[in-house]
Amino acid sequence: EKTEDSFYVSVQSKSATDIDQKGIAVCIADLVDLNIKKILKKIQKIEPYAEFQNLHILLDGALKTSLKVGNQKTIIKGDEKELLISLASVYAKVTRDTYMKKISKNPKYSQYGFEVHKGYGTLNHRRAIQRGGLSDEHRRSFCGRL
């Protein structure tokens, strides 16, 4: 009998406003559950009678899910230890960087240089915030000390 392994990834994000209002920990927990639910839906479309008890869910760092599905494993520094977590991490980063490049074309954000630093806390990004203030893409809870 031939078995086939599959790798599924889902990337979702929360707005800066959501993160500031609910807190980063709550938003991350919500996103972990949301992503797992989206992956389960993808699997059910491909295999309508899939049994999820054989599903292996790898979570990086201290991530946890409230969902009682599959065989879940949390791995500290998982992106250094598990190839699949590394791949998912790169996929998420590229997705975020692509989004930042896209919004950098909007005149509303042109002063921030998102196309260069993609929102990471570089010196040029911090200087742009000091010159122009925070935009709705900035987490005030994170940028408070600028």
Question: What does each model-found stretch correspond to?
Answer:
Residues 1-146:
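RNase H-like, Mg2+-dependent phosphodiesterase core
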